[in-house]
């Protein structure tokens, strides 16, 4: 490839890439070309309206100069006529006008460096000037670019796109020039396009000046790339660098619609809906303009979503489908949760089987309502309760039999049902935790404080009403007889002491068994003195003052060891010192029970007691 001459004003690029050409017959046609170009430029300037006065966002005069005013109808007609003439001269037939010819292609910033790592100029940075046969494509491309720039400036006045007056001059000059397509205005070096790239490759514009941050101003002679250290041609302030894009280098551009994406360090201009007032919808215009690009240059749908395009009309249908699918998924999950809740609510509430009294109420309620004028349910229930208690045992037995059959039928229908299922779950958890705690205390706490029948099954504590029934009310505890909180139910939770009743006495409890009465050890007695209040006084036996003699120590030793093994087999209890004496003959142990009871009462009377705390003995 020919090299550049050294040390000239044309030495502005790499030696292996750029070559400078001069026009043939430039001296002869210079005057005529200059006059025609100046005449056309004057016509264009006279028909344009300066729009920089309405733009308040311009920060300098250079930006106002770079921002071209909108074109008039006359220039638009001329551009279209020249475009049609150039299209008629084409022999390939691949160029077809878009549905809206005023928006022919898309402006894309140069997001990557135009230089490759090895120092050579990439194909994306090559200037488009080529010739196929005797047809000029540079004129067509330049005019097409002018139409695109003018359209963008008209539709988006805030979008800064360079367009200089020399470009229109270059377009008109190239359109009329019969010389080969190596003519350059203002000595801008150009390179012939490679032969393997199709001459009809669409033109995609770049602007390093306005999009890429960190580049020096275009009027400064920055000949060295700060990143690679390779000399590069500076762009004049009135000519923006436009490069063609070859098919093989499309993958180097990360965002084909990057001119709509604000880059780092760039001022973000809001693109409102007012700027998108097209004769056609925005999405249709973009799709129609992109239909001219080859399939490999059209960006995929997912890039439109990831680039964050502000206007909603540019979002493709696939993105809308994805969002709708996510919404449908969230709605489906919420509906699934609601259906679960509804299923729990729709779960049938299994009622408890009716007991005997409920069956009686069900049968006799209509009669009571017919006899009485009362409509209150509480009053009717009271009347039914009085009549139920007035019934004889034989009459009640009929309803008890019906209740038993009702329970059997209920167990057949709902085998795993429990009445606890109808109550709260928190209470159910507490009941599940209680059996483990009560089993730990079941060995030693067998009710030494109260003389009640022992509880055999502590894992399922029941009240006296459920344990003994109505027929054995003599075995109920005092609180259950007065319809208070059951003592056995409290014992099932691990406590052995019952709260005092409303009247402060425990006289309503059933009488204690004789085998549990005995002289308690000192430790146990002191414990009972501390725990029991002073008001819990028991009636003393009237025969207790008759026998004041101390009992034989052998009897105390035998009974103490027997009670210690019966009350708490795990713990060792201290015995009184009199019990440690040698045992008497067996004949002295076999005494009547009355004498032993009197001896215990006399021992209790001789020992110091707080106030009137004495044990009650059986007659």
From Swiss-Prot:
Residues 1-53 are annotated as: CTNNB1-binding. Residues 47-57, 318-328, 604-619 have a biased composition (Polar residues). Changing residue 201 to V: Reduced phosphorylation by NLK and enhanced DNA-binding. SMART domains: c-clamp, HMG. Changing residue 465 to C: In a colorectal cancer sample; somatic mutation. The modification Phosphothreonine is found at residues 201, 212. Residues 496-508, 574-603 have a biased composition (Low complexity). InterPro entries: Catenin-bd_sf, CTNNB1-bd_N, HMG_box_dom, HMG_box_dom_sf, TCF/LEF. It is linked to Constitutive activation and subsequent transactivation of target genes may lead to the maintenance of stem-cell characteristics (cycling and longevity) in cells that should normally undergo terminal differentiation and constitute the primary transforming event in colorectal cancer (CRC). Interacts with TGFB1I1. Interacts with CTNNB1 (via the armadillo repeat); forms stable transcription complex. Interacts with EP300. Interacts with NLK. Interacts with CCDC85B (probably through the HMG box); prevents interaction with CTNNB1. Interacts with TNIK. Interacts with MAD2L2; prevents TCF7L2/TCF4 binding to promZIPK/DAPK3oters, negatively modulating its transcriptional activity. Interacts with ZIPK/DAPK3. Interacts with XIAP/BIRC4 and TLE3. Interacts with DDIT3/CHOP. The CTNNB1 and TCF7L2/TCF4 complex interacts with PML (isoform PML-4). Identified in a complex with CTNNB1 and FERMT2. This is Transcription factor 7-like 2. It comes from Homo sapiens. The gene is TCF7L2.
């Amino acid at each position: 490839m020919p090299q550049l001459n050294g040390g000239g004003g044309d030495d502005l690029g790499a030696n292996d890439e750029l070559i400078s050409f001069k026009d043939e017959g430039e001296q002869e046609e210079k005057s005529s070309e200059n006059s025609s170009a100046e005449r056309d430029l004057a016509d264009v300037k006279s028909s344009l309206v300066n729009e920089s006065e309405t733009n308040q966002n311009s920060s300098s005069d250079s930006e106002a100069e770079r921002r071209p005013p909108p074109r008039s109808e006359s220039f638009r007609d001329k551009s279209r006529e020249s475009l049609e003439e150039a299209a008629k001269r084409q022999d390939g037939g691949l160029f077809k006008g878009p549905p809206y010819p005023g928006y022919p292609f898309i402006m894309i910033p140069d997001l990557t460096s135009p230089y490759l790592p090895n120092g050579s100029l990439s194909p994306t940075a090559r200037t488009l000037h080529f010739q196929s046969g005797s047809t000029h494509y540079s004129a067509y491309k330049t005019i097409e670019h002018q139409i695109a720039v003018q359209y963008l400036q008209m539709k988006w006045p805030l979008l800064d796109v360079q367009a200089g007056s020399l470009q229109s001059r270059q377009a008109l000059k190239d359109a009329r020039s019969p010389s080969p397509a190596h003519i350059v205005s203002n000595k801008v070096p150009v390179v012939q396009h490679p032969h393997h790239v199709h001459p009809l490759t669409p033109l995609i514009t770049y602007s390093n000046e306005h999009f890429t941050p960190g580049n020096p101003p275009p009027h400064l002679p920055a000949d060295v790339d700060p990143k690679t250290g390779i000399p590069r041609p500076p762009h004049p302030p009135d000519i923006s660098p436009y490069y063609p894009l070859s098919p093989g280098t499309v993958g180097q551009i990360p965002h084909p619609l990057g001119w709509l994406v604000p880059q780092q360090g760039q001022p973000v201009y809001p693109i409102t809906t007012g700027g998108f007032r097209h004769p056609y919808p925005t999405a249709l215009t973009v799709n129609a303009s992109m239909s001219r690009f080859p399939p490999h240059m059209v960006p995929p749908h997912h890039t439109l979503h990831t680039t964050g395009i502000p206007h909603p009309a540019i979002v493709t249908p696939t993105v809308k489908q994805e969002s709708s699918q996510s919404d449908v998924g969230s709605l489906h999950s919420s509906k699934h949760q609601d259906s679960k809740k509804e299923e729990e609510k729709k779960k049938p509430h299994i009622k408890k089987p009716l007991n005997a009294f409920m069956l009686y109420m069900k049968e006799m309620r209509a009669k009571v309502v017919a006899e009485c004028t009362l409509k209150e349910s509480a009053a009717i229930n009271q009347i039914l309760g009085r009549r139920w208690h007035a019934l004889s045992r034989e009459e009640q037995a009929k309803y008890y039999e019906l209740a038993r059959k009702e329970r059997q039928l209920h167990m057949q229908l709902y085998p795993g049902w429990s009445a606890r299922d109808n109550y709260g779950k928190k209470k159910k958890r507490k009941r599940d935790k209680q059996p483990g705690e009560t089993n730990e205390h079941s060995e030693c706490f067998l009710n030494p404080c109260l003389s009640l029948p022992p509880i055999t099954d502590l894992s399922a504590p029941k009240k006296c009403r459920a344990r003994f029934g109505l027929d054995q009310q003599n075995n109920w505890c005092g609180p259950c007889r007065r319809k208070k909180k059951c003592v056995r139910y409290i014992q099932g939770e691990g406590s052995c002491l019952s709260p005092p009743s409303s009247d402060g006495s425990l006289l309503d409890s059933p009488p204690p068994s004789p085998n549990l009465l005995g002289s308690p050890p000192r430790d146990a007695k002191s414990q009972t003195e501390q725990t029991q209040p002073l008001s819990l006084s028991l009636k003393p036996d009237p025969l207790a003052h008759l026998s004041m003699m101390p009992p034989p120590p052998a009897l105390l030793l035998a009974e103490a060891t027997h009670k210690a093994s019966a009350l708490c087999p795990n713990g060792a209890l201290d015995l009184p010192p009199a019990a440690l004496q040698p045992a008497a003959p067996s004949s002295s142990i076999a005494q009547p029970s009355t004498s032993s009871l009197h001896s215990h009462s006399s021992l209790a009377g001789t020992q110091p007691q707080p106030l009137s705390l004495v044990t009650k003995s059986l007659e």
